[in-house]
């Protein structure tokens, strides 16, 4: 007869997502309605992403914030500019503190990114454009690049 351990959540290392939320959202559509008529070609998209990590007052609780900005332009107009600060509160349970930086910089952003991506797609579509579907982001590669730049 086998025994099943039902106590796994209390002892196993895991990440708990306690909250997800929009901290700030801004969309500018400065050339409308003229820019909406000029959508015969695919716009140039300039995208920037930053991650902010804040240690909260309660032990092993962190806020991970994605800052995403996208600017779309064509030959004539700045079509739109969208800025989103989207965050999550994470509890790192039974995880060695040496692993916290990589988890907070890679795994936690990857968990909330699909929600931020959806918000940006919905907002740009509601502004009269094709939804901006941001490609998946390799947060691991970004983390390793940042670490190698920091060492140099």
From Swiss-Prot:
TM spans (from-to): none
One GO MF term attached to the UniProt entry: unfolded protein binding
An example Gene Ontology CC term for this record: cytoplasm
Gene3D superfamilies (UniProt xref): SecB-like
CDD domains per the UniProt record, alphabetical: Translocase_SecB
InterPro entries: SecB, SecB-like_sf
GO terms classed as biological process: protein folding; protein tetramerization; protein transport
Cellular localization per UniProt: Cytoplasm
Keywords (A to Z) from UniProt: Chaperone, Cytoplasm, Protein transport, Translocation, Transport
UniProt-listed Pfam families: SecB
Highest taxon above the source species: Bacteria
Coiled-coil ranges per UniProt: none
Main location: cytoplasm
Protein family per UniProt: Belongs to the SecB family.
Subunit structure: Homotetramer, a dimer of dimers. One homotetramer interacts with 1 SecA dimer.
Cited function: One of the proteins required for the normal export of preproteins out of the cell cytoplasm. It is a molecular chaperone that binds to a subset of precursor proteins, maintaining them in a translocation-competent state. It also specifically binds to its receptor SecA.
Protein name as it appears in the record: Protein-export protein SecB
Organism of provenance: Rickettsia conorii (strain ATCC VR-613 / Malish 7)
